[in-house]
Amino acid sequence: DLDEANDASEIEVNPVMITGDRDVVAADAVMNIDEDALFRQPDLAEMAEESYEDDLERKAGEYGFDYVRLSGNVGIIGNGAGLVMTTLDLVDHYGGSPANFLDIGGGAKAERVTQALDMVFSDPNVDSVVFNIFGGITRGDEVAKGINEALAEFDEIPKPVVVRLAGTNAAEGMEILNTDLIEVEETLEDAVQRAVRNAEEVTQ
């Protein structure tokens, strides 16, 4: 089997999309290899080294994030591939240009949220950031704590950040967020539109 032959701990096709012509397309596929078994997979180990296009993608791999660097200037962080894809599509819909796909995954703790923001802030192409979290496993108050911790690392916020929290403990998260440093929107549409405007203002 594919997983046993390659020492894979996970094989996933996600997301699957339906095109306007009703064709089904596997938009992304991921195979995670057990790092402790790479000595048995020299070809895969070499491919892993070659697959990193830059330091950000290498760092994302170390953090365990699903990350793809794009050519735009609006940084996108979310929890869940579908949610991030929706945010990416809305950025494009409202006239912006996505800078990345960054999925922090379910149940992300404050440390991982801090790592995600640090990554996006480190991208010189990013002019603004939209952070979209729908709480389930990932609690809104935990995410808010992580955002505040990340922001505390900077003497001044390097790029404008718009946050949208919904779902589990979202109200508590909204109260925790330092709104002196970031902007908060209740709906995803409003958050994306503000992030796109922020990016436009930076580039003017």
Task: Give short role names for the model-derived ranges.
Residues 1-13, 17-131, 143, 166-204:
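ATP-dependent carboxylate/acyl-activation modules
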Residues 119-122, 149-153:
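Short basic/hydrophobic patches in alpha-helices and adjacent helix-turn junctions
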Residues 134-138:
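Glycine-rich, proline-tolerant flexible connector loops at the mouths of alpha/beta enzymes
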Residues 139-150:
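Short Gly/Thr/Asp-enriched flexible loops that form oxyanion-binding sites at enzyme active sites
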Residues 150-167, 185:
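Short, acidic/small-residue loops that bind anionic groups at enzyme active sites
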